[in-house]
A protein has these predicted regions:
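Short amphipathic alpha-helix segments
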Residues: 9-27
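Short connector loops at helix/strand junctions that flank enzyme active sites
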Residues: 1, 38, 60-62
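Surface-exposed aromatic
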Residues: 39-44
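Short loop/turn and capping residues at structural boundaries
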Residues: 34-35, 71
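A short linear hydrophobic-aromatic micro-motif
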Residues: 28-34
Length: 72
């Protein structure tokens, strides 16, 4: 298992609902959360080793949101 951590501009419950389906239905995402009370709107993903940071950034950007790797 891998832990991936990102800074996003997903800053409301409505925005979370927008991406919820893609995260819940993704076969390599085991669990995820977005902290909209954090200044960085942190997206934390528990994933299999098959999911990479670039995959998540691409997925999120398809929905019009910004997503940057926080751990680097």
């Amino acid at each position: 298992m891998r832990i991936l951590v990102f800074q996003t501009n997903i800053d409301s419950k409505h925005h979370i609902e927008t991406v919820q389906t893609i995260f819940n239905d993704h076969s390599h995402i085991l669990d995820w959360s977005i902290d909209i009370e954090d200044i960085d709107n942190v997206l934390r993903i528990e994933a299999t080793h098959h999911l990479h940071e670039a995959d998540v950034m691409h997925l999120v950007s398809q929905y019009g949101f910004n997503c940057e790797d926080l751990v680097g």
